[in-house]
């Protein structure tokens, strides 16, 4: 039966305020771990007299400087993100390495109880540190950050998501949380980290600390910052998996809502810089200068085999793997959705409960990771092992754990390890007989559920690596079941399993395929990987949405998809426009402007000319709240309602109208005017966008949505069908296209008639 519980249905956000009132003009969302107000970004260039004069005044040197700085910033993004990614991996591998070495040494000495205490207490301290600094210093750093970055690139802005404080806590918190053996990843936080680096570089410094760079003034707008953030997100993926092309495709397929060839070149340049820098740094680690776990983290999971081949008989198990990945992926998304909702009710009780939950998850995880290997039987070391067996303390396939000399614990090799090294063990070639069925199955179940319960804690945590390790475990299990009936070795099945689970949860095909190919250095798997990704995505799409879209909905982000809902074609623009509409005259009294700004939260106001400037009321343009505040602070008032002269424009600089960064924005309460000034007038004509986008009120809502999203605008003016009415009948914003708003205005619209086909199973209902 059809099911409308996915992205086609009305979002049921986590916020109680959003659940109670869906038609509120002010919007909030969960950013990281806290509820924050959100605003829309404006990618439209305001074509007013002041902008035209400023653009004409730019010299050829300034234009060259602008183009050159674009490429220089992309280079800087690549350098900084690669250094952060390397430091992140180095810190995690060594922190976790010290913990595992100390614990293993105690177990070798027979002090199992003390080993557990050291292991669990270390994990608890690291988790407590990560959750405390995140909850109290930078709540926006919680989670992976990918939903926030994806929403930003769609046009949704939130405070502090790209601030310096968020960047620092994201790095330190993720290092601490991953080192605590929580089943979380580094890739998602690296995407957010790259976006933070890009945004900070594009801000041109900080006025608060008197550190500003005038040569970056041209980038203080939403359009250029959007491009830089896209470069940063791609660089983050490239730094996580050493996959430069995969990073480009990830930004294209999953993150960016607007794309063009010029941006593609700059993103490719950034990821290429990341790859080169990481290669140089990794060469240093190969010489043993990076501490305990220098060969983990960013080193390739090399499963290349010259004699790897497959036949027609291998296609059927690969198809089965894709179907299983789609079903398990949709189940994973469903359960994660429910867990995040449950966590939110706990978080509503206060910060203390957030930290207590993180500590509880840490203790539970430590008990499982330490205790489960005792269920596995010891295996004799293979005589032809290519590495030391058993491996004591360090990474490897052969963990000694509680086993006698000459034996190893295969489950400990997977579960009592870092996530990166667990993936290396699962992907490793020529290891078809080193893991037992029971151990791989236990590891899969543990990863599947632990990653679900670990993601929602108040700490920087990603999903990419847990999904890979979970998929790799059941992929290897399928390969073990097939045994000699398949020409593919178990390591290749693990890679295909990881691909199928990524396709089932994240629904990315092209970028996932390239990332895994770059990660494993095995191009021979390309056809099989393409098939398994297509099947897993197709199967999973029959049940629910991809994981990041689900999380964005839960957080309350008003994300605009590239397609319009079918029921929108049955509604006109005029059906969703709500009032009252606030309009300014071209020459307006200052007192009126201040009153409107104080009594409304609107960020855009139509400017209308009437007699004596025009025979009948006519639309002149649109002016933004931020620009009005700049005019009020400058106090360019006139004693009578007359147009300003050219000298007025010369009093302003383009930087004064530039978009501020992550700092505190201007507010009307900060503007103090005398009674004399309130009775004066302000000419809005030179500063209004004289060519705003407009639609007639009889246009279908679906068509207006496509225009709104593709152009990337913040305000869409609605004009009347007939001429005997006011020149503007309303303004469409992002909020007006949200399903909960539309169906709140028109509850009689039958959604079931227009919903997409979904499969309903009793478990998913």
UniProtKB/Swiss-Prot annotation:
The keyword Transmembrane is assigned to this record: yes
Membrane protein topology class: Multi-pass membrane protein
Modified-residue entries (Phosphoserine), positions: 646
GO cellular component, one term: chloride channel complex
Domain CBS: 568-640, 687-748
Transmembrane annotation, as ranges: 67-87, 116-136, 167-187, 190-210, 232-252, 262-282, 315-335, 355-375, 438-458, 462-482, 494-514, 515-535, 715-735
Pfam family, one: CBS
GO molecular function per UniProt: voltage-gated chloride channel activity
Compartments it resides in: Membrane
SUPFAM superfamilies cross-referenced by the UniProt entry: CBS-domain pair (SSF54631), Clc chloride channel (SSF81340)
Keyword vocabulary terms for this entry: CBS domain, Chloride, Chloride channel, Ion channel, Ion transport, Membrane, Phosphoprotein, Repeat, Transmembrane, Transmembrane helix, Transport, Voltage-gated channel
Family: Belongs to the chloride channel (TC 2.A.49) family.
Subunit note: Homodimer. Interacts with PP2A5.
PANTHER family: CHLORIDE CHANNEL PROTEIN CLC FAMILY MEMBER, CHLORIDE CHANNEL-LIKE PROTEIN CLC-G-RELATED
Protein purpose: Putative voltage-gated chloride channel.
Name of this protein: Putative chloride channel-like protein CLC-g
Organism: Arabidopsis thaliana
């Amino acid at each position: 039966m059809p099911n409308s519980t996915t992205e086609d249905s009305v979002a049921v956000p986590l916020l109680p305020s959003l659940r109670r009132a869906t038609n509120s003009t002010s919007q909030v969302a969960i950013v990281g771990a806290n509820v924050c107000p959100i605003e829309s970004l404006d990618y439209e260039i305001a074509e007013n007299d002041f902008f035209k004069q400023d653009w004409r005044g730019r010299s050829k040197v300034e234009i060259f400087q602008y183009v050159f700085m674009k490429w220089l910033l992309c280079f800087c993004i690549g350098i900084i993100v690669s250094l952060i990614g390397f430091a992140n991996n180095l810190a995690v591998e060594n922190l976790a390495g010290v913990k595992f070495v100390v614990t293993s040494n105690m177990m070798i000495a027979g002090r199992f109880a003390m080993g557990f205490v050291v292991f669990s207490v270390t994990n608890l301290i690291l988790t407590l540190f990560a959750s405390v600094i995140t909850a109290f210093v930078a709540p926006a750093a919680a989670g992976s950050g990918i939903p926030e970055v994806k929403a930003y690139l769609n046009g949704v802005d939130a405070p502090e998501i790209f601030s310096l404080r968020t960047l620092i806590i994201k790095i330190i918190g993720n290092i601490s949380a991953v080192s605590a053996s929580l089943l979380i990843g580094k890739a998602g936080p690296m995407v957010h980290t790259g976006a933070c680096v890009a945004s900070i570089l594009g801000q041109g410094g900080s006025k608060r600390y008197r550190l500003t760079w005038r040569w970056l003034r041209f980038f203080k707008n939403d359009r250029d910052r959007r491009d830089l953030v896209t470069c940063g997100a791609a660089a983050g993926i490239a730094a996580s998996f050493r996959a430069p092309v995969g990073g480009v495709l990830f930004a294209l397929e999953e993150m960016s809502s607007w794309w063009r060839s010029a941006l593609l070149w700059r993103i490719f340049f950034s990821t290429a810089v990341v790859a080169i820098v990481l290669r140089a740094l990794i060469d240093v680690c190969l010489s043993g200068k990076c501490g305990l776990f220098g060969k983990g983290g960013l080193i390739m999971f090399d499963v290349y085999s010259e004699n790897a081949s497959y036949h027609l008989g291998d296609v059927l198990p690969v198809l089965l793997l894709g179907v299983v990945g789609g079903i398990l992926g949709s189940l994973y998304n469903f359960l994660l959705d429910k867990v995040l909702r449950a966590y939110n009710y706990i978080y509503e009780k206060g910060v203390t409960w957030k930290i207590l939950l993180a500590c509880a998850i840490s203790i539970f995880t430590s008990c499982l990771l330490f205790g489960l290997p005792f269920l596995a039987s010891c295996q004799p070391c293979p005589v032809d092992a290519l590495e030391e067996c058993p491996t004591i303390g360090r990474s490897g396939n052969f963990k000694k754990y509680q086993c006698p000399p000459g034996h190893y614990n295969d489950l400990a090799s997977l579960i009592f390890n870092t996530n990166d090294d667990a993936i290396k063990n699962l992907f490793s070639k020529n290891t078809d007989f080193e893991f037992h069925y029971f151990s791989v199955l236990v590891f899969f179940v543990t990863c599947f559920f632990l990653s679900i319960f670990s993601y929602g804690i108040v700490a920087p945590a990603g999903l990419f690596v847990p999904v890979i390790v979970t998929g790799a475990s059941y992929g290897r299990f399928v390969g073990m079941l097939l045994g000699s009936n398949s020409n593919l070795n178990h390591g290749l099945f693990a890679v295909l399993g990881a691909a199928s689970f990524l396709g089932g949860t994240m629904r990315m095909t092209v970028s996932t395929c390239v990332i895994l190919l770059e990660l494993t250095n095995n191009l021979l798997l390309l056809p099989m990987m393409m098939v398994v990704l297509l099947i897993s995505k197709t199967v999973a799409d029959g049940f629910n949405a991809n994981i990041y879209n689900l999380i964005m909905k839960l957080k309350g982000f008003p994300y605009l998809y590239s397609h319009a809902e079918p029921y929108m074609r049955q509604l006109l623009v005029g059906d969703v426009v709500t009032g009252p509409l606030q309009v300014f005259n071209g020459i307006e009294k200052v007192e009126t402007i201040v009153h409107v700004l104080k009594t409304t939260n609107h960020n855009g106001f139509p400017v209308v000319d009437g007699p004596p400037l025009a025979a009948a009321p006519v639309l002149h343009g649109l002016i933004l709240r931020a620009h009005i505040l700049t005019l009020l602070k400058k106090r360019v008032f006139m004693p009578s309602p007359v147009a300003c002269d050219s000298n007025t424009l010369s009093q302003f600089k383009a930087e004064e109208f530039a978009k501020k960064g992550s700092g505190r924005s201007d507010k009307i309460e900060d503007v103090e005017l005398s009674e004399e000034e309130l009775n004066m007038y302000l000419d809005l004509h030179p500063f209004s966008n004289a060519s705003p986008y407009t639609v007639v009120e009889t246009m279908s809502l679906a068509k207006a949505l496509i225009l709104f999203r593709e152009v990337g605008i913040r305000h869409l003016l609605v004009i009347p069908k007939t001429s005997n009415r006011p020149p503007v009948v309303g303004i469409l914003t992002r909020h007006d296209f949200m399903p909960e708003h539309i169906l709140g205005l028109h509850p009689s619209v039958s959604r079931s008639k227009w919903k997409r086909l979904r499969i309903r199973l009793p478990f998913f209902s």
